[in-house]
UniProtKB/Swiss-Prot annotation:
Pfam families in the cross-refs: ABC_tran (PF00005), TOBE_2 (PF08402)
Catalytic reaction list: ATP + H2O + polyamine-[polyamine-binding protein]Side 1 = ADP + phosphate + polyamineSide 2 + [polyamine-binding protein]Side 1
Hydrolase found in the keyword field: no
Descriptive protein name: Spermidine/putrescine import ATP-binding protein PotA
Family assignment from sequence similarity: Belongs to the ABC transporter superfamily. Spermidine/putrescine importer (TC 3.A.1.11.1) family.
Enzyme class at the top of the EC tree: translocase
Subunit comment: The complex is composed of two ATP-binding proteins (PotA), two transmembrane proteins (PotB and PotC) and a solute-binding protein (PotD).
Primary gene name: potA
InterPro entries for this protein: AAA+_ATPase, ABC_SmlMolc_Importer, ABC_transporter-like_ATP-bd, ABC_transporter-like_CS, Mo/tungstate-bd_C_term_dom, P-loop_NTPase, PotA-like, PotA_ATP-bd
GO CC terms: ATP-binding cassette (ABC) transporter complex
Main location: membrane
Binding-site residues for ATP, renumbered to this chain: G54, P55, S56, G57, C58, G59, K60, T61
Organism: Trichormus variabilis (strain ATCC 29413 / PCC 7937)
Domain ABC transporter positions: 22-252
Length: 381
């Protein structure tokens, strides 16, 4: 089989070739003549944990359904392990899907739910026995094999759904918001289990989620979608630290955005005057767009901003303001600061267990030139 490959670098910097498990080439999907998926291009490498992240209605679930075969591509190409998937039904694709709703059969116990797909394929009884046993062991559900779904917790049902997907030994496991129905504590626990399962099996996982933290913590790479299009693909660190668009900067985590125009453009820094009159200096580095437009957006993460009662000496990006809200979050404290030009900014600082300042306290907010990022202002931003 001639499988497409992608170039990557190992930790020593030596280029190697990795096969691609899933490829989308300029893929479109229309509903009522409106594009739900609009010219999507992406490659998913073999053994990768790849997440498609975006808000409701962005096209991420439709993209997953196209890969699974539940929807058909209207234009473009979709390949799995180098083979075109045009008109290939779901049951003939080397993929299995884990749904948010689990989709377990209530009248079947755990063992029979996991065995269902193998029996449908008329697998030998001995093979069904060994593979179901192996799958249940992977998800730590051997002792509950005789229970019915109604007798299981949400986390246990999720494990059964995972086992049912893994028992068929697919090349690609598709996860449709798999942890969305779980409470926060259980979701955190299942994130760890899902990550360990992926590492132990070495399979390709493609997950759809709207949960930024979930995508950042689990993924090797993330594709951020918006209005049917891919805004950016990168590692979690690249997506968070080096967003390419203001949508990505705003959607991934929290950020403070300032729209303005470049007034000084030097080799080492950029000076921007915002629409509200602030002058912000941004250090130029490898993350700065090669071609900057006159209109830009400055992104500053809340955790990059410092607060002090007195102005630091000879420092750019220092602005006077007042505290208008203080929110205690346990390990951190979130401050809402209104700058002298009337703009509100969010500041996140570690909890030092001291007395919190009162509201209306005059304060100075400042950040380093290297802690903010200039992004080209697009027409739809």
């Amino acid at each position: 089989m001639n499988m497409a490959q992608t170039v990557t670098q190992n930790p020593r910097g030596v280029k190697t070739l990795l096969p691609l498990d899933v490829e989308l080439r300029n893929v479109f999907k229309f509903f009522n003549q409106e594009p739900a998926v609009h010219g999507v291009d992406l490659d998913v490498k073999q053994g990768e944990f790849f997440s498609i992240l975006g808000p409701s209605g962005c096209g991420k679930t439709t993209t997953l359904r196209l890969i699974a075969g539940f929807e058909q591509v209207d234009a473009g190409k979709l390949l799995i392990q180098g083979q075109p998937m045009t008109n290939i039904p779901p049951y003939r694709r080397p993929v299995n899907t884990v749904f948010q709703s689990y989709a377990l059969f209530n009248h079947l116990n755990v063992w029979d739910n996991v065995a269902f797909g193998l029996r449908l394929k008329k697998s030998r009884k001995s093979e069904v026995e060994s593979r179901v046993k192996e799958a249940l062991k992977l998800v730590k559900m051997e002792s509950l094999r005789s229970r019915f779904p109604s007798q299981l917790s949400g986390g246990q049902q999720q494990r059964v759904a995972l086992a049912r997907a893994l028992v068929n030994r697919p090349a690609v496991v598709l996860l449709d918001e798999p942890l969305g129905a779980l409470d926060l504590k259980l979701r955190k626990e299942m994130q760890v289990e899902l990550s360990n399962l992926h590492k132990n099996l070495g399979l390709t996982f493609i997950m759809v989620t709207h949960d930024q933290e979930e995508a950042l913590s689990l993924s090797d790479r993330i594709a951020v979608m918006n209005q049917g299009k891919i805004e950016q693909i990168g590692t979690p660190q690249e997506i968070y630290e080096r967003p390419k668009t203001s949508f990505v900067a705003d959607f991934i985590g929290d950020t403070n955005l300032f729209s303005g125009e470049i007034t000084v453009l030097e080799a080492e820094y950029i000076q921007i005057v915002t629409k509200t009159g602030l002058t912000i200096v941004v250090a130029r580095n490898e993350d700065t767009p090669a071609e900057l437009l006159k209109s830009v957006v400055v992104s500053v993460r809340p955790e990059k901003i410092q607060l002090s009662l007195y102005p630091p000496s000879s420092l750019n990006n220092c602005f006077e303001g007042r505290l208008i809200n203080v929110m205690y979050l346990g390990t951190h404290v979130n401050y809402l600061v209104q700058l002298i030009n009337g703009i509100n900014i969010n500041v996140l600082q570690p909890n030092t267990f001291g007395n919190l300042p009162d509201r209306e306290t005059p304060i100075y907010a400042w950040w380093a030139e290297s802690d903010c990022l200039a992004i080209n202002q697009m027409t739809n931003d």
